[in-house]
Amino acid sequence: MAAVWRRSARLFILLQRHHSCTFTSQNLNHFMRSQKVMTDQSQTDLGLFKPPSTVRGMTELDRSAFNQTVSVPAIRLPTNILNKAVKSLKKVALQRPGLKRVVEEHSEDGNADCGNIEHRLLLLDPNSITSSDSFGSDEAEALKAYSVPQEIQSYELKLTYENFKSEEILRAVLPEGQGVTSGFSRVGHIAHMNLREHQLPYRKLIGQVIIDKNPGITCVVNKTNTIDSTYRNFQMEVLAGESNMVAKVRENGVLYEFDFSRVYWNPRLSTEHERIVSLLHRGDTVVDVFAGVGPFAIPAARRGCAVLANDLNPESFRWLQHNAKLNKVDQKITTSNLDGRDFIRGPVRERLPALMKGSQKIHVVMNLPALALEFLDAFKGLLDPEPDQSLSNLPQVHCYGFSKENDPQRDVVERAEASLKTNLQGQCSVHLVRNVAPNKEMMCVSFTLPRGVLYKTHTQDRDTSEEPCPKKQKCEDSTN
């Protein structure tokens, strides 16, 4: 019986499986590894630390509107044991962004009593300490040891915009009862957001809050359409900050530079890049059909592999060459700026016979999930027959695809088989890369390229079997 999948809370539960291909899945925690933080309205109530209700509906950021005064519990500590006492009370001390938890006492007129150098106040978490009896046994024993009375007093604390977290600010500003997000993918100094329709009127404010609350972020952009262009880049709107789109990114120890507005880069694929590179050995050859700016090609070259890297996008091609030089591996990478099929039927076909006579492995990476499975047909009858084909070192293919089917594993295998016009039974493995969106998965099917597919037979005529190669391919969104 074929594998039957059910989705529940974005997790896959494999109920029953009997398939010739092996399925592998990374720990689901790794799927979510990215610089992304999502805010859920079901989080614990903020209590005293909610921003003022008057900020609801604000579309232009007014930081002064967040000023307010709240009463919090505090305990009076002698300065001569202050550091020790604060350490002992760390679990119940107040912790808020930009706030000092040790403050001077107020005089009768409400101002700080600068003349009192013998005592200070430690501000306490009002969710933990509500009375003198709220201290736990450890805190109570520590106070007793320091001869400090368990007496709580009220302290008038002035809160400003600086003391609130980004999700707290956005939850207070956006319409109540609707989804709130402070999530973004970080690409160097750029925060890339995918805002929902109801958030768009607040997009400028959201962008400024993200910059204010995330050191190092100097530009916030929002995607304004899906990835439907020839080159997989997308239109974007700058919400806040500078308009500099040239980003510097370090991934798995490799430095990349590129114009984020003109190439494709997804920080959520870092783990997948690392997984494929871990399969490589010094002396192997890597054929990267849709190389982008080099997230597979450059680490492979650094690992001692010979690399043939290609991308149709002239900007990706330019930055691929730039990054190869930047990482001092340009002598190990041969680059092309061709359509994927032209690349396979041109430079790859020319090099493949000699490579297959060697003992080192050949890995073909095809990371264009919206279309790569269709490009597999370029391998059909690619090579002329040889006298002793049994000695050939056949390439290992790693081909990516999206699936919206209930059984994504079976779906991508069947689509690969349809393109190759062969049965991959017992010759492939399928890897779940990540959940892209509800009911949409990114998969990787790996297999040894069948000899019967690669070599031309007497019934095949390459001149008639090859169809014209479309130069412009439409790609669906892979980031959602």
UniProtKB/Swiss-Prot annotation:
Protein name per its UniProtKB record: tRNA (guanine(37)-N(1))-methyltransferase
UniProt record, GO biological process: mitochondrial tRNA methylation; tRNA N1-guanine methylation
Catalytic activity: guanosine(37) in tRNA + S-adenosyl-L-methionine = N(1)-methylguanosine(37) in tRNA + S-adenosyl-L-homocysteine + H(+)
Any single Gene Ontology cellular-component annotation: cytoplasm
Segments of this protein annotated with the region Disordered: 458-480
HAMAP family documented for this protein: TRM5
Targeting signal (transit peptide) range: 1-18
Known role: Involved in mitochondrial tRNA methylation. Specifically methylates the N1 position of guanosine-37 in various tRNAs. Methylation is not dependent on the nature of the nucleoside 5' of the target nucleoside. This is the first step in the biosynthesis of wybutosine (yW), a modified base adjacent to the anticodon of tRNAs and required for accurate decoding.
EC id: 2.1.1.228
Keywords: Cytoplasm, Methyltransferase, Mitochondrion, Nucleus, S-adenosyl-L-methionine, Transferase, Transit peptide, tRNA processing
Residues annotated as binding S-adenosyl-L-methionine: H273, D311, L312, D339, G340, N367
Record-linked Pfam families: TRM5-TYW2_MTfase, TYW2_N_2
GO molecular function: tRNA (guanine(37)-N1)-methyltransferase activity; tRNA methyltransferase activity
Subcellular compartments: Mitochondrion matrix; Nucleus; Cytoplasm
Domain of life: Eukaryota
Subunit structure: Monomer.
Family stated for the protein in its record: Belongs to the class I-like SAM-binding methyltransferase superfamily. TRM5/TYW2 family.
